[in-house]
Regions:
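Short, surface-exposed acidic
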Residues: 31-41, 75-88, 141-145
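An amphipathic alpha-helix signature
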Residues: 19-24, 62-70, 127
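A metal-dependent, Asp-based hydrolase signature
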Residues: 49-90
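Asp-based, Mg2+/Mn2+-dependent phosphohydrolase catalytic module
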Residues: 1-4, 32, 110, 126-235
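Active-site neighborhood of HAD-like aspartate-dependent phosphohydrolases
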Residues: 1-6, 11-45, 75
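Substrate-recognition element of Asp-dependent hydrolases with the DxDx(T/V) motif
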Residues: 87-88, 92-98, 105-137, 147-151
């Protein structure tokens, strides 16, 4: 049976929307959408760095959650202290309770489910927070709990080979029939490829392929619609 496993954040839904709403609620100085996009990209960059440090036990989860917006704001000379960063994170989490799937992703999940594909989730993050998002997106309509994997419960995070091997052994997967879909090149694409899986890069932020990349995605799409069309062609 073909198995298709999805990342969650910024793959199944637009993660930037919650960030935009949070900034517009809390920042006294109005920012344009483009300025918020730049702040969001900086926040994601620092989030990846600090998440890895948190996973290694070098900093606390709180320092990761507040540190990313503090570092991003510093880049743009926006004043913010730990108290305001805490409020930002709490508001951001609240806004994530309103997330919805990309419409084409919902259609894709319906198509794959009807075709009898085995569908799963692999997402990095803290268990409670990621579970909240999975519930908000109503992913249990297509993906059962036993096919849902959160790094915080496994003890390893992407791109470590161990997290992919864990799932492979748990589900007795055939590498040649297993596809992973994610937006993050290093964590999702390199992680899946070095484990021997096929990988589709959901590159809707239109990032450049790293020049030093030792692995390349099997397919690259730039929107949820392109992802849907890719699987419709295969049908």
């Amino acid at each position: 049976m073909d198995t298709i496993i999805f990342d969650v954040d910024d793959t199944l839904y637009d993660q930037a929307q919650s960030f935009h709403r949070t900034v517009k609620k809390l920042f006294q100085e109005p920012l344009s959408d483009e300025e918020i996009n730049q702040l969001y990209q900086a926040s994601r960059k620092y989030s990846e760095i600090l998440f890895d440090q948190s996973e290694a036990g070098e900093i606390t989860p709180f320092e990761w959650q507040t540190g990313r917006i503090k570092a991003a704001c510093k880049d743009f000379n926006i004043p913010i202290d730990t108290e305001k960063a805490t409020i930002f994170h709490e508001t951001y989490v609240t806004e994530q309770k309103n997330i919805t799937l990309f419409p084409e992703v919902e259609e894709l999940l319906n198509v794959l489910y009807k075709e009898g594909k085995q569908l799963g989730i692999l997402t990095n993050g803290e268990e409670k927070h990621q579970a909240m998002k999975i519930k908000q997106l109503h992913l249990s309509r297509w993906i059962p709990a036993e096919m849902t994997f959160i790094s915080g419960t496994i003890g390893h995070a992407k791109p470590k080979r161990e997290v992919f091997d864990f799932i492979e052994q748990k589900l007795d997967l055939d590498q040649t029939k297993t596809v992973y879909i994610g937006d993050h090149f290093e964590k999702d694409i390199i992680g899946a490829k070095q484990a021997g899986w096929q990988a589709i890069w959901m590159n809707h932020r239109k990032k450049d392929l790293p020049s030093h990349a030792t692995y390349k995605p099997d397919k690259e799409v730039h929107s949820a619609k392109e992802l849907l069309d890719l699987f419709k062609k295969k049908a």
